[in-house]
Structures are given as C-alpha cells and as structure tokens.
Amino acid sequence: MRYEYVPLKDQYEKEIVPALMKEFNYKNIHQVPKLVKIVINMGIGEGSRNYDLIERHANELAKITGQKPIVTRARKSISNFKIRKGMPIGLKVTLRGARMYNFLYKLINIVLPKVRDFRGLDPNSFDGRGNYSFGLSEQLVFPELSPDEVRRIQGMDITIVTTAKTDQEARRLLELFGMPFKRG
C-alpha cells in the first residue's frame, strides 16, 4: 500500500484525538469517536425514464468523488410516481479512508464557502446516533465541474457516519475538523 499524505487524518491523529480525550474524559484512545464513512446520495426522479440522465450524473458524481457511483434501484413499485420495482432512481457513493478525508477537506474548505447564502450547517441534523446528514441543492459548487458541462442542476444528500455514541460527541468531532455549524 502506498503512503499518501492526508491533511485531515494527520490533524485528527495529532490534534483532535487528544482534545476529545481531554474534553470527554476518555480512558482509552479507542473510545474517541472517528469518521467511518461518507455517503453521497443523488436521487434522480426522471432517471427511471431517461437512462442518459443517469449516465451524465454518474460521470459528474465520479468527478466529484473520484470513485464510480453505484446505481440505486427502486425496492418496490409506486404507481403515483410511475416507478416499477428495479427501476434506476438514483446514484450512491460510499467513501472511506483517504478518499473520505480528502472529500471532507474539500467540502469544508472549498465547497461550503461557495454555496450561495450559506450561514452554516444546521446543528440539529444529527440522527441521535452520532451521524450527520445534510443536503446540497446543486452540484456546481464543486470545483471539478464547470458550468458548461452541467446540463441539469441536481442536488445531493451527504451523510457523515461516525463511531460517536451521542450527537454531542459527533458535533464536537466535526467542529474540530472545521465543519461550519450555525451559532445559536
């Protein structure tokens, strides 16, 4: 395995772990919460009728994450949405390891500052088990995509999965990484 310098992982090991151990009085280093994975989900409503649309968004998501997305399919038929079981309805990428840390770094330092009218992430979007989810309304905020090659603006959901037992621990972990939460 080749060695790759990952700035956020280095910061986690040298600064964040000691700070969390002191703040939450952990006895063992393995009690300290850490990032497990980041899941990026892009639901494509018209994807079931237009396979070219799924291909285009799959290429965009691959450029953004550096990893090929998988196509998510409908689990059951819903006649009101004109969806049959097995139809493609979205794309999903699960990032772990160095790609996860690099994506989080890019998200915090490049992408979120480019979002229009951004006043911070909602601190109440934790799920009760230490995982954080939020949505982006357009994919154009990522530097890998140029406005000329994007034909249709599409949002995405991003879920950050941690080993934290409580939302308070997870929020503090993400704050130490530099995640911009709303104050108040």
From Swiss-Prot:
Pfam families on file: Ribosomal_L5, Ribosomal_L5_C
Signal peptide start-end: none
Q: Which UniProt keywords apply?
A: Ribonucleoprotein, Ribosomal protein, RNA-binding, rRNA-binding, tRNA-binding
Picking any one GO biological process from the record gives: translation
Q: Which GO terms describe its cellular component?
A: ribonucleoprotein complex; ribosome
User: What job does this protein perform?
Assistant: This is one of the proteins that bind and probably mediate the attachment of the 5S RNA into the large ribosomal subunit, where it forms part of the central protuberance. In the 70S ribosome it contacts protein S13 of the 30S subunit (bridge B1b), connecting the 2 subunits; this bridge is implicated in subunit movement. Contacts the P site tRNA; the 5S rRNA and some of its associated proteins might help stabilize positioning of ribosome-bound tRNAs.
What is its quaternary makeup? Part of the 50S ribosomal subunit; part of the 5S rRNA/L5/L18/L25 subcomplex. Contacts the 5S rRNA and the P site tRNA. Forms a bridge to the 30S subunit in the 70S ribosome.
In the record, the note on similarity to other proteins reads: Belongs to the universal ribosomal protein uL5 family.
What name does the UniProt record give this protein? Large ribosomal subunit protein uL5
Q: What is the organism field in this record?
A: Thermotoga sp. (strain RQ2)
